[in-house]
């Protein structure tokens, strides 16, 4: 038998749960104010694109998707999936380092492949950039990646030092 909460009580119950989950020593202002910084080094992609290279929110850094372009250009490296995957991961490392981070700080990656049949080939290259324990990861097939790329990877990193 399932029971439902009367509609009039829902706001009160939600407010109680949210208040109960707030740390006792955290002032409300601190919860509402998190530093947000938009980061653009120009070391991988040109600063003229309509998105940030990365965004730092508190100690979390969200990297925009990277493809296998030669740094400072909008040209994919030649050599297909293996070359693009290597350059993509090199670009991620360069972007992280430009903002005081490393691949060891990465906690999540999202991998988009133009052809899921290249998943195993990508994994071989990916594994050479990380050591266990590996970041959490999702991989999906995607049609129409930027610049006709074979692979695009976006990452989330946790900074070990405050902003």
Please provide the spans of the model-predicted regions.
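N-terminal presequence-like segments and the immediate start of the first folded domain
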Residues: 10-13, 17-90, 94-99, 104-107, ...
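Bacterial N-terminal signal peptides that target proteins for export
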Residues: 1-10
């Amino acid at each position: 038998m399932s029971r439902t909460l009367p509609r009039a009580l829902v706001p009160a119950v939600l407010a109680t749960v949210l208040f109960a989950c707030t740390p006792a020593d955290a002032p409300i202002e601190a919860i509402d104010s998190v530093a947000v910084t938009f980061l653009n080094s120009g070391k991988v992609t040109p600063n003229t694109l309509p998105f940030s290279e990365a965004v730092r929110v508190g100690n979390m850094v969200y990297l925009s998707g990277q493809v296998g372009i030669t740094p400072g250009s909008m040209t994919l490296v030649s050599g297909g999936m293996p070359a693009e995957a290597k350059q993509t991961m090199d670009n991620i490392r360069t972007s992280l380092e430009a903002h005081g981070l490393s691949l060891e700080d990465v906690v999540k990656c999202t991998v988009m492949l133009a052809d899921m049949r290249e998943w195993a080939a990508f994994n071989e290259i990916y594994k050479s950039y990380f050591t266990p324990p590996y970041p959490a990861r999702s991989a999906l097939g995607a049609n129409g990646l930027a610049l006709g790329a074979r692979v695009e990877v976006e990452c989330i990193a946790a900074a070990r030092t405050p902003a």
